[in-house]
Amino acid sequence: GVSSAASDVYKRQMCFGVMQALDELGIKAGSVFGTSVGALHAAMYAQGSMDAAAALWDNIRLSDVVSEESLAIADDAENIFDHPEKLLEFITRYAHQKGVDVSPLMEILHRLIDEDRVRRSGVRLGVVTTRFPSLAMVEKRLEEMEAGSLHDWLMASASCFPIFPMKQVGGDRYIDGGFCDNTPVEMAVRSGARDIVAIDIGKHRSHTQYDRRPNITYIRTSQPLGGLLTLDSALSARNRILGYNDVMRAFGRMRGVSYAFDAVDAQALYTRAHHVV
């Protein structure tokens, strides 16, 4: 079966463009692995409710989940995703931060994600989080999670400290999985996935060792997607189109770099231009 390794902080609407394209291509994932918001989307995909996920980002207001103080920290947090060697310094700097009250976000997750439905789906689910204070990467698969703990593990993966508080699960504290691995393609590989579609929205190239694996389609975003906490309807619509186009290019249905053309139209344009020249 096909496995999808979802990157994050997913720039939200790009995910839905990606899933729309995969659906049109007839690609159904038997396993989904996600980090941070990508973990939330992975769970929603597993239970077959991506429309609900789209509605979440279409209707949520930033003020529902973060404070103005958190917005000021967002740029620093996003830079750390690209420079993990500075993570300890970053955590120390903001150690006094308690983060915002995430109970409204947890209520949204409980409303949108039904753990029993996810477990019955037959889709294998995995998430990445970061244990604190060791900063060790933790990969957690659905079958390893205690009954009733799925939402806790999803929040552990998406606890972008210090914007959000650390998440305690069992006796350990966790922060955002993106601090360790923003694109859990290696988790998919270790889980035995045969054919993998990996979506990487990071600013810098990562996991380049998988670029030429015949069983891995590694898709990197072709354009900047906006900031960590950007909630803008026009940007969201653009990102959805970018996600769709990037997947279609990767599977040969579209051509182009900065622009995307239907593969047949692109060949016709090339032929016409060649005759003109």
Briefly describe each language-model feature range.
Residues R205-L225:
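Short acidic, glycine/proline-enriched helix-loop-strand junctions
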Residues D58, L62-V66, D114, S159, ...:
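Generic secondary-structure signature for well-ordered alpha-helical cores
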Residues Y10-K98, V102-S103, L109, E139-M155:
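Patatin-like phospholipase
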Residues D75-A198, I216, D246:
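Active-site-adjacent alpha/beta core region of enzyme catalytic domains
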Residues C15-F16, V185, S233:
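Conserved strand-to-helix beginnings and helix N-cap segments that scaffold or border functional pockets
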Residues G202:
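Residues in the short beta-alpha loop(s) of Rossmann-like NAD(P)-binding domains
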Residues G1-A6, Y10:
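Single conserved hydrophobic/aromatic residue that forms the stacking wall/gate
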Residues Y218-V277:
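C-terminal helical/tail subdomains of lipid-metabolizing enzymes
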